[in-house]
Regions:
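Membrane-embedded transmembrane-helix bundle of lipid-linked glycan/lipid transferases
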Residues: 1-239
Length: 239
């Protein structure tokens, strides 16, 4: 019942936009469309070095499934919204002890659009920053899970898997959009402060710092190679 309520709210607030507004709902989508089309011509970073994780994903959907890129950019925002709220619900269910609180939290987040539409407006569009939010939430969850592990269990396989998942999630935020990484980074700082007594211990500190550095390197490496090869930075990175 709660799932149906959440799905109903999502379809009413976001899904009906597919019918009511068939087209681009943000002015910068044509720019991203151009960059993705250039990838089809073998030109990555055509307008300068920029996080291209989102563009690679759209390009993959276009190439493998044969759907026109402009159509994907018109419709895919709703897939993003579904995944975002699904990840949020899963995280809340894993962290909350109360059975119904996660559903209430997600529903309240969705219907908040009625009171603050401008805050949610860009989620009506297929954009890199909004797509990257899907991976901010797992970054937060896996870092919390890591600090919840007792010292004697840090060498277990589960700990390695948690750190690997954190590295992948955080790395994906950086590969998709820097703003998502900033949000994830601020959340990570808050979590580290909350678990400060464990964070400063060598066993925890070394593991999480090495994991964090590796996750950044994985995301930055393709961009660094392109920049070292003479491709300039895309202008918006100066924002």
């Amino acid at each position: 019942m709660f799932i149906l309520l959440i799905l109903g709210a999502m379809f009413w607030i976001y899904g009906r936009q597919i019918i009511l507004t068939y087209g681009y709902r943000a002015s910068d989508i044509p720019v991203h469309l151009s960059w993705i089309n250039q990838m089809s011509r073998g030109k990555i970073f055509s307008k300068g070095v920029y996080p291209f994780g989102f563009h690679c994903m759209i390009y993959y959907l276009h190439t493998v499934f044969g759907v026109d890129t402009y159509v994907i950019l018109c419709e895919f925002f709703f897939v993003q919204v579904i995944y975002l709220h699904a990840v949020l619900l899963v995280m809340l269910k894993l962290l909350c002890k109360t059975k119904y609180l996660p559903y209430i939290g997600v529903f309240a987040y969705i219907v908040g659009d009625f009171w603050s539409g401008q805050t949610y407006s860009r989620f009506y569009s297929t954009l890199p920053q909004e797509y990257g939010m899907i991976f901010v939430i797992p970054s937060v969850y896996f870092l919390i899970r890591f600090f919840q592990i007792h010292k004697e269990n840090l060498k277990d396989r589960e700990t390695r898997r948690i750190l690997q998942c954190f590295a992948m999630s955080f790395s994906l935020t950086l590969a998709i959009h820097f703003y998502g990484t900033m949000i994830a980074g601020l959340c990570c700082i808050g979590i580290a402060m909350g678990f400060c007594f464990r964070f400063v211990k060598k066993e925890y500190f070394c593991r999480i710092m090495v994991t964090g550095i590796l996750s950044v390197v994985l995301a930055v490496l393709p961009m660094a190679i392109a920049f070292a090869g003479g491709t300039p930075l895309q202008g918006s990175l100066g924002w």
